[in-house]
Amino acid sequence: MQNLELFEKAVVMILNMDGWNLHHVGGMSHYDAVGETPKKIPCVLEIKFRNTYYPTKMLEQYKYEKLMQENKVALYFVNDPKGNYLFWLNNLKMPDPIDMYCPDTTLWTKKKLLKPCYLLDESMATIVNENEEAKPGVWDSYFNKQKK
């Protein structure tokens, strides 16, 4: 859980370097950061890190409803092995929810619960940064020779 919070804080810091004014909330809040967009519009941000790539990004309906109740710009940031995706939820026509088995929210159990979720297509994201495969650099052959 501690590493996850460090990753969330890193996303907040990177967005702040790009003109945002966000503060990490942490804890049991319904969102991970609160603040302002670069245009000074109040916002809340939910951040998810996924270890596996899927072409659709899952957002629990409950989480979506809690974000929308804040009456601020609601944002959903997803990082997975293929890239980073930022969804501006207020502007989206949400698909019909689908019941999916999701981890229980308590930390001391491994059971899964059936929860209604939205599956957001990557094309619905406003900002997409795709990760690139690492390519050999100019110094790689030199350092490979040094290892032998």
Predicted regions and their residues:
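Arginine/glycine-rich "motif VI" loop of SF2 helicases in the C-terminal RecA-like domain
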Residues: L67-N71
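Conserved catalytic cores of phosphodiester-cleaving nucleases, focusing on short active-site segments
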Residues: A33-G35, K39-N51
